[in-house]
């Protein structure tokens, strides 16, 4: 499956396989990438927290067999996989909304990540500055810039 996803990437499609269904979007814009880079630069561990290992736009294979490419995935330790999809479950994910793909980023992705056991899901819309922070126990709305504490012991600014 990963080979097919990488073939799609080679022709300019960002393809994911979620719950047995293919989802695609065009490659991200400069605005999107600037937001991802800014957020990644802000990720840091709180005292005694996890090491906050974070990667951008890398395939993660989830427990149900789905393949997704979170804009940012935050792990509690270094993943073992270097040349294939990561199978370690992220502690948290951040998705930055792409214009034209709001439904995927605001409705499909958060529900999916939480169903797979991700503890914190953050969705940022760089056009409206809306920040949604979703956890198994609730959802919280913020306006960027905002500093968020994650369950794993990391802090980030969105």
Language-model features: where?
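Gly/Pro/Ser/Thr-rich low-complexity, intrinsically disordered segments predominantly at protein N-termini
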Residues: 1-158
């Amino acid at each position: 499956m990963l080979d097919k996803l990488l073939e799609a990437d080679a022709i300019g499609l960002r393809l994911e396989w979620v719950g047995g269904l293919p989802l695609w979007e065009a490659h991200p814009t400069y605005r999107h990438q600037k937001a991802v880079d800014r957020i990644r630069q802000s990720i840091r561990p709180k005292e005694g927290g996890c090491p906050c290992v974070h990667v951008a736009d890398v395939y993660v294979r989830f427990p149900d067999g789905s393949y997704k490419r979170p804009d940012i995935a935050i792990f509690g330790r270094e993943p073992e996989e270097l040349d294939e999809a990561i199978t370690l479950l992220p502690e948290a994910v951040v998705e930055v909304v792409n214009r034209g793909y709001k439904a995927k980023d605001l409705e499909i992705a958060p529900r999916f990540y939480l169903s797979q056991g991700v503890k914190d899901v953050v969705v940022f819309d760089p056009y409206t500055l809306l920040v949604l922070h979703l956890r198994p126990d609730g959802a919280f709305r913020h306006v960027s810039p905002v500093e968020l504490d994650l369950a794993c012991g990391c802090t980030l600014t969105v």
